Each structure stands twice: as structure tokens, then as C-alpha cells.
């Protein structure tokens, strides 16, 4: 910019690399700053049963062909390979991962691999039916999106969600034994910034 001081920073190659080291045959996976990579996020689908205003349009979405979506066998093999170079934590995401058919089967497959942490990010709409089976399958933790505790606002931001269903799902998750559930909230000025105290109180209870 004209008149502004110029700040020159070195260009860092952010490509992952494998360095030789103890612990595995190939050594741990590291990033361009030599930090070990131990955490993997896997998007199971780009499909979702919500249309949150900050995430996607209400209609006209270009979805990936189903043939391009990784099979459970491919996901399992990828996780096994990455565990050999240091990955110990996996989070299943989407889209909305609970709309993926036979999700419980995938969780069972991955839980048998001996990961330190296996978690799932979800909008919570299907937790009433899935919380207990997910826990039994070996899932360790849940991340659940709750942007508001007001039904009118919830419907406004999700365009089709059911707040009562999500809150009931959180109750089911706690009853199933999920004791370290994380609640995610997108802070939006002028929309839900008057609810942060109430959201914290809800999570505390």
C-alpha cells in the first residue's frame, strides 16, 4: 500500500513432510515448521440436513458425486496408514456426518484401531437415536453446534432445524456416557450476542 511500511516475512513451505525418527518405521508426520501432526479431520460427506446461513445457501448446492465419497474401507486404510506416522486423534465431520449411512459401522471400525481420541462434530439433530449406539461403538467425544437457545432464532439460522430435538439429543448423549461433550457456538453480532451468558449457564448445568 502506498505510504505504508513494508513488512517482509520469509515464505514457509507448509507442505507436510515425513521425517525419519524413532517410534515408527518412517518417523512422525510433520508440517513445514517441524511440528508433529497427530490430529486428523475426516469429512464423511458434504451433505447436511440443515442449511445454516453462515455455512451454505438454502438451495442450489453442488454436491460431490457419490462415487467420489470415500468408502469406509478407504477411510479405515487411510487412518491406519496415518497412525503409522504419528496420527493419534481423529474427528469425523461433514457436512453432517450423522446423515452418512451406516455411521455406526465406521465408528466401530475406527475404534478398533486404538486411537487416543475419536470424536464427532454434529448439529445434534439425530443424537436422540444415535447417541447410545455411537457410545457403544467406541466413540469418545461429541462436538455439538448450538448457536442459540431460542427456537425462533434457531430456525432462522438453520433454516430447518429443531432446537428441542437437539437439546433432547444432548440429554441422550449425557445419559449414554458422553461426559466431555463440547458445545460449539458461532458468535454473531446482533443475532445471538445477547445469549452468551445463557449458553454458558446451559453448558454448566
Q: What annotation goes with each model-predicted range?
A:
Residues 96:
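Conserved G/P- and acidic residue-centered "switch" motifs that form tight phosphate/ATP-binding loops
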Residues 72-91, 99-197:
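Radical SAM/AdoMet-radical enzyme domain recognition
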Residues 197-205:
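Short, intrinsically disordered, charge-balanced linker/junction segments flanking boundaries
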Residues 25, 29, 33, 65-66, ...:
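Glycine-rich, flexible loop/turn motifs
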Residues 1-41, 47-51:
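Flexible, acidic/Gly-rich N-terminal and inter-domain linker regions that tether
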Residues 19, 23-25, 50, 54, ...:
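Short, flexible segments with low predicted structural confidence
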Residues 33-73, 84-85:
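Canonical Radical SAM [4Fe-4S] cluster-binding loop centered on the CxxxCxxC motif
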Amino acid at each position: 500500500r502506498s505510504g505504508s511500511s513494508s513488512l517482509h516475512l520469509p515464505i514457509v513451505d507448509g507442505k507436510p513432510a515425513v521425517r525419519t525418527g524413532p517410534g515408527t518405521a518412517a518417523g512422525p508426520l510433520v508440517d513445514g515448521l517441524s511440528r508433529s501432526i497427530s490430529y486428523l479431520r475426516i469429512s464423511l460427506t458434504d451433505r447436511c440436513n440443515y442449511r445454516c446461513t453462515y455455512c451454505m445457501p438454502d438451495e442450489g448446492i453442488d454436491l460431490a458425486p457419490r462415487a467420489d465419497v470415500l468408502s469406509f474401507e478407504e477411510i479405515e486404510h487411510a487412518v491406519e496408514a496415518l497412525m503409522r506416522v504419528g496420527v493419534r486423534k481423529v474427528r469425523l465431520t461433514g457436512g453432517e456426518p450423522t446423515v452418512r449411512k451406516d455411521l455406526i459401522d465406521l465408528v466401530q471400525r475406527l475404534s478398533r484401531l486404538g486411537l487416543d481420541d475419536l470424536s464427532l462434530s454434529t448439529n445434534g439433530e439425530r443424537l436422540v437415536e444415535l447417541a447410545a449406539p455411537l457410545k457403544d461403538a467406541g466413540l469418545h467425544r461429541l462436538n455439538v453446534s448450538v448457536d442459540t437457545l431460542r427456537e425462533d432464532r434457531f430456525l432462522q439460522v438453520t433454516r430447518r432445524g429443531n432446537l428441542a430435538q437437539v437439546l433432547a439429543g444432548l440429554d441422550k448423549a449425557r445419559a449414554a456416557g458422553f461426559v466431555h461433550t463440547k458445545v460449539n457456538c458461532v458468535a454473531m453480532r446482533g443475532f445471538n450476542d445477547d445469549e452468551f451468558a445463557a449458553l454458558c449457564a446451559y453448558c454448566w448445568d
